[in-house]
């Protein structure tokens, strides 16, 4: 893949997003999953993985690519392959996230790696997300994205 060196230059790129842990997304997911959870109040801890309810992208329709994701070349590198999939990941919980927490997620592109598979070129991008509240690091997560 001739553009690999240019794509590797995206390693180390970061972006930060701030959010507020509110109860509405928790109530909505509880209802969707038909759970009988008590209404979350200030200080209620998020169950594991429910941090995915926050830091949602807000792209204008004109900024969305044909694959339904944000057009390439924003935070993620402009990989010239047709499909993007989540290939795996790792999660570490350091401290609970709670309703009322002001939080910040800092995302970093850790690596961009080319491989050749049965169907041709593959590009793997590993993105690390660190989520902090006022007390410090709460969640560390890595996403393996394959193109």
For every predicted segment, state its role.
Residues 1-102:
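Hydrophobic, proline/glycine-rich low-complexity stretches
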Residues 1-14, 86-147:
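HotDog/MaoC-like acyl-thioester-processing domains
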């Amino acid at each position: 893949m001739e553009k690999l060196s240019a794509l590797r230059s995206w390693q180390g790129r970061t972006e930060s997003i701030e959010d507020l842990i509110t109860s509405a997304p928790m109530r909505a997911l509880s209802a969707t999953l038909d759970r009988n959870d008590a209404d979350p109040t200030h200080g209620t801890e998020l169950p594991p993985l429910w941090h995915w309810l926050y830091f949602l992208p807000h792209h204008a329709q004109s900024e969305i690519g044909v694959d339904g994701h944000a057009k390439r070349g924003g935070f993620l590198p402009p990989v010239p392959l047709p499909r993007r999939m989540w290939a795996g990941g790792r999660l570490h919980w350091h401290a609970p996230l709670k309703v009322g927490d002001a939080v910040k997620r800092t995302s970093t592109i850790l690596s961009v790696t080319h491989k050749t598979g049965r169907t041709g070129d593959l590009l793997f991008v590993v993105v690390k997300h660190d989520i902090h509240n006022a007390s410090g690091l709460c969640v560390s997560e890595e996403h393996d994205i394959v193109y």
